Amino acid sequence: MKAAAVRFLAIVLITLALSAPVAAQSDGIRATISGQMDAFRADDFDTAFGFAAPNIKSMFGTSDRFGTMVRNGYPMVWKNANVRYLELRELSGNLWQMVQVEAQDGSFHYLDYMMVETENGWQIAAVQFLPDPGVGA
């Protein structure tokens, strides 16, 4: 009985130790996405552009062009009413944070944020639309 309790405790401690880095990643990732969402709501595209990874910055070049893309292609993100963080997962070596975004009109949208850790902390390297998980279920 005592050996079983010791094994159980060891498993719990190992699980906690392994999950701690994920929790730390999750906090940093959420802070990055939240910071960009706050900047979008304030129409502060300079700050929002600062959360973009180097590949995105290179693609758009300026915060003005980035802002135009967001306003036209991601209006629910630009003027979001609420953001809910869903699953954080690793796919093919990349970390993807799924979010549910509530738009100003009350509609819900699901997006996946590919996150990269840089010398400046977590940054957003890609965003893609996801199908509504409730559709077709």
Predicted regions, residues:
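Bacterial N-terminal signal peptides
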Residues: 7-19
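Residue-level detector of flexible, active-site-proximal loop/helix-junction positions
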Residues: 15, 55, 131
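N-terminal secretory signal peptides that target proteins for export/translocation
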Residues: 1-4
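Exposed beta-sheet edge and beta->alpha loop/turn motif
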Residues: 87-137
